[in-house]
Amino acid sequence: MIYIIDHQDSFTWNLVHQFSKFDEVYCSNYFEINQKKLDQSNTIVLSPGPGSPRDYPQTSKIYNKYKGKKKLIGICLGYQLILFNEKGKIIQQKNIYHGYQSIVRVTKESKLFKKDKNFKVGRYHSLKLLEPFKSNNIKISMRCAKTGIPMGIEDLKNNVYGFQFHPESFLTENGKTIIKKILSA
């Protein structure tokens, strides 16, 4: 079962629809966690949402409790939450990307996606990871081809993955394939 933690974002139900193509999905609001269902899940998805990662201490506790024990996937805010909990600094970026399509390039650090492959993604964010970012396990797996901003992460040791972009967006090429690849990792 996939447990999606909803950070009160309209894209969450698009994620529910996409992930339900691969497994049973349970979704609840971040402040109404069903602990029994969370424990039963094999994958936890941290959804997009408004604000900053520091606005969601409940989700940070869940991330830290289940990291290395269950597959964790972060989308947009969820991606930022993962990096924030790994001592990454999340900052306001110069340009805001809400409803923009950009090209991302897969980095040589990616073990799941074909190195140097480019594809279009849908972006809806005003925050980004400040670099340099140091981690023993988390690798930057994708970057914006134009700006170099990190757009994807992989931590194979702890089974943690994330995307700054929205794989469920109509602006993202092959979003279903991206989700399938992460779920089968």
Could you say what each language-model-derived stretch is?
Residues 76, 125, 166:
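Histidine-centered divalent metal-coordination motifs
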Residues 110-157:
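Catalytic beta-strand/loop cores that center a nucleophilic Ser/Cys/Thr
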Residues 43-110, 120, 179:
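Cysteine-nucleophile active-site neighborhood
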Residues 167-185:
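Acyltransferase
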Residues 11, 127-130, 169-171:
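Active-site environment of divalent metal-dependent phosphoester hydrolases
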Residues 32-41, 133-134:
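Short amphipathic alpha-helix with an adjacent loop that forms part of the alpha/beta core around
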Residues 20-36:
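A short, well-structured beta->alpha microelement
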Residues 2-21:
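Short, charged N-terminal beta->alpha structural module
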